[in-house]
From Swiss-Prot:
It comes from Clostridium perfringens (strain SM101 / Type A). It catalyses: L-seryl-[protein] + ATP = 3-O-(5'-adenylyl)-L-seryl-[protein] + diphosphate; L-threonyl-[protein] + ATP = 3-O-(5'-adenylyl)-L-threonyl-[protein] + diphosphate; L-tyrosyl-[protein] + ATP = O-(5'-adenylyl)-L-tyrosyl-[protein] + diphosphate; L-histidyl-[protein] + UTP = N(tele)-(5'-uridylyl)-L-histidyl-[protein] + diphosphate. The keyword Transport does not apply. This is Protein nucleotidyltransferase YdiU. The active site is at D256 (proton acceptor). ATP binds at G94, G96, R97, K117, D129, G130, R180, R187, D266.
Length: 490
């Protein structure tokens, strides 16, 4: 089948502009394929958004694509090369178990990568087997869709297939392949790779390509590389604020897991915070708390500093001048983050305007929440609904004092109560993909029962809907002496 007929049948409008880059950035390779694949999850709503034929793709025809048994006609899949600072240590990486099938261009001109994750070994696999297990792929499907509904920029999941093979991790698990949709997979680590192992022309080609793809408005600007750096810094500041505002902890914020588009990517050891504690860590390999909840803004800044270092030759031919430009740009992150963070927190507290003591008010609430081990999400839900059930925090003198200050501040707004509540409801999710709910969904799914997962996914489509039907998803996990721990799944 040629590309035209394939497009007519599936809705995929295919290109691969990444192949226009110098060949140090990729390696052409076909997926290994699956012997006995089965379509486990297909994202019908995402398929519709992309203008795809969901009926055809949710069939054996689509299954063969998602299982790596068929590739897009006329387009060679590629594994992308990149580097990464893993827990601060620089290393050569690349797609060790993923292949970019191509790019889908929607009718309104938006371009999306279509990538298979878990499709077999590549030249970048190092010691890995190139495969993925079912539970981590379903986990990414659930959480990425949850993040999307929360309004947080993220890669999406189009499909998950089981391969019919077993993969060895801590134990033997069902093999799987995830089809991931992303604005692109260009990472901070891609630029670090170009700066370390490429020529100046390679670096320039990558920057020009990325600007054209993600920031076309600056493509013809005289100082486009400086503006490029500033745009990426701004997007990351916005993204991290959105993470923090819902208690999302990425878990492995290496430079290879920060994409230039400003989307959330790679959901391996991520989790959502229940009890508010800035030191919260879930990842089994984050022994020192490098990527703890409260440290995520600092880690984003650290990653962006590495990005600016990679761009130095493009910022100015004179190294000293380039360093000064980079420092000035990087210094803006903290100001931007603070601005976006307090704006978001004002909205979570029903405040439309900015006042001098707002920061103290916000910090006062958070410190009280930490002291009394309040649930992050449910505390803001309680404030939104004006219903207080957590005796420990809400009966404390600190909270009562804070509550009076907050009510006084709301009076200064002089807004109708309905307006205030609507603002709070639109910024305080009623439900999130809580860790114990996700784990229950995965546990059942591994046994072949997808009922709970399907119900959870349906509920997560409307996280800001304060519906009685969703109340069961607001319940906290049972108290346990065993802390919740996440794993990369690789």
């Amino acid at each position: 089948m040629d590309n035209k007929n394939f497009q007519s049948k599936t809705g995929f409008n295919l290109e691969n502009t990444y192949l226009t880059l110098p060949n140090i950035f990729f390696s052409e390779q076909n997926p290994k394929g699956s012997k006995n694949p089965k379509l486990i999850k297909f994202n019908t709503s995402l398929a519709k958004e992309l203008g795809l034929n969901e009926e055809i793709l949710n069939s054996d025809f689509g299954l063969n694509i998602f299982a790596g048994n068929e590739t897009f006609p006329g387009i060679t899949p590629i594994a992308q090369a990149y580097a990464g600072h893993q827990f601060g240590h620089f290393t050569m990486l690349g797609d060790g178990r993923a292949l970019l099938l191509g790019e889908h261009v929607t009718k309104d001109g938006k371009r999306y990568d279509v990538q298979l994750k878990g499709s077999g070994r590549t030249i970048y696999s190092r010691g890995g087997d190139g495969k993925a297990a079912l539970a981590p792929m379903l986990r990414e499907y659930i959480i990425s869709e949850g993040m999307h509904s929360l309004g947080i920029p993220t890669t999406r999941s189009l499909a998950v297939v089981s391969t019919g093979e077993e993969v060895l991790r801590e134990k033997f698990e069902q093999g799987a392949i995830l089809t991931r949709i992303a604005s692109s997979h260009i990472r901070v680590g891609t630029f670090a790779y170009a700066a370390q192992w490429g020529t100046l022309e390679d670096l320039k080609s990558l920057a020009d390509y990325t600007i054209k793809r993600h920031f076309p408005n600056i493509a013809n600007s005289e100082n486009k590389y400086i503006l490029f750096l500033e745009e990426v810094i701004n997007r990351q500041a916005e993204l991290i604020v959105k993470w923090q505002s819902v208690g999302f902890i990425h878990g492995v914020m290496n430079t290879d897991n920060m994409v230039i588009s400003g989307e959330t990517i790679d959901y391996g050891p991520c989790a959502f915070m229940d009890t508010y504690d800035t030191n919260t860590v879930f990842s089994s390999i984050d022994y020192a708390g490098r990527y703890a909840y409260g440290n995520q803004p600092n880690m984003a800044l650290w990653n962006l500093a590495r990005f600016s270092e990679a761009l130095l030759p493009l910022l100015n031919p004179n190294l000293d001048e380039a360093v000064n430009i980079a420092k000035k740009s990087i210094s803006s992150f903290s100001k931007l983050y603070k601005k976006y963070w307090f704006n978001k927190m004002r909205a979570k507290l029903g405040l439309f305007t900015k006042k001098e003591n707002d920061e103290l008010l916000i910090e006062g609430l958070l410190s009280t929440m930490q002291k009394y081990e309040a649930d992050f999400t449910n505390t803001f839900v309680s404030l939104t609904l004006n219903k207080f059930e957590d005796e420990k925090v809400f009966s404390s003198n600190e909270f009562k004092t804070w509550y009076a200050l907050w009510k006084d501040r709301l009076k200064e707004e002089n807004r109708p109560k309905e307006e205030v509540r609507n603002l709070m409801m639109n910024n305080n999710p009623y439900i999130i993909p809580r860790n114990h709910l996700v784990e229950e969904a995965l546990k059942n799914a591994e046994k072949g029962d997808f009922t709970f997962m399907d119900n959870l996914l349906e509920a997560l489509k409307n996280p800001y809907s304060y519906s009685k039907d969703l109340e069961k998803y607001t319940k906290l996990p049972e108290k346990s002496d065993i802390p919740y721990v996440t794993y990369c799944g690789t």
